[in-house]
A protein has these predicted regions:
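Short coil turns linking two alpha-helices in DNA-binding domains
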Residues: 41-42
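Short acidic, hydrophobic short linear motifs in intrinsically disordered regions
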Residues: 25-35
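Basic, amphipathic "hinge/linker" alpha-helix immediately C-terminal to the N-terminal HTH DNA-binding motif
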Residues: 63-81
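Basic amphipathic alpha-helical segments that dock to polyanions
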Residues: 34, 45-55
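A short, conserved structural fragment
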Residues: 53-63
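C-terminal regulatory/oligomerization modules of transcriptional regulators
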Residues: 104-137
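Short alpha-helical segments that sit at the start of domains
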Residues: 1-17
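Pre-recognition alpha-helix immediately N-terminal to the DNA-recognition helix
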Residues: 13-21, 73, 84
Length: 137
């Protein structure tokens, strides 16, 4: 995913990550579930999904949404960066929930290769503070 061509917003990031975590169970997600989880109205969620669809990151059909191959890769990269920086923040003494919140504010802005450098500096943890795997190592 080229950073300039497919730059995403924080709201789009939140939506991508939620869809990845939900659909990892193998099922598409309903638009109203996305709206409810993101605490936005359905038209707002619809607009976010449309933007993600235009960027080739999701497919939407009959109110059901799933990630495309490109969307899965984008979400995977975001989660690698997120879990890396969450680990760094916790190792630096920031409480876990605050570390997660802070990582969510920047994880979609940092290239994966930079996160991998940070990962090496913090001794390559296998999982984030929540116990979720830091993929792709």
């Amino acid at each position: 995913m080229s950073q300039m061509a497919n730059a995403i917003t924080k709201r789009e990031r939140d939506c991508l990550v939620f869809i990845e975590e939900y659909t990892g169970k193998g099922f598409p997600i309903r638009l109203h579930e996305i709206a409810s989880t993101m605490k936005v109205k359905s038209p707002t969620a619809f607009n976010v999904i449309k933007r993600l669809e235009e960027k080739g990151l999701v497919e939407s059909r009959n109110g059901m949404v799933k990630l495309t191959t490109v969307g899965k890769e984008a979400a995977r990269k975001i989660l690698i960066v997120h879990r890396t920086f969450e680990s760094l923040f916790c190792q630096s003494g920031i409480p876990m929930e605050k570390a997660c919140e802070e990582a969510s504010d920047i994880d979609f802005l940092i290239p994966e290769n930079n996160a991998r450098k940070v990962l090496k500096r913090i001794d390559n943890p296998k999982v984030c503070p929540h116990g979720k795997p830091i993929w792709g190592r």
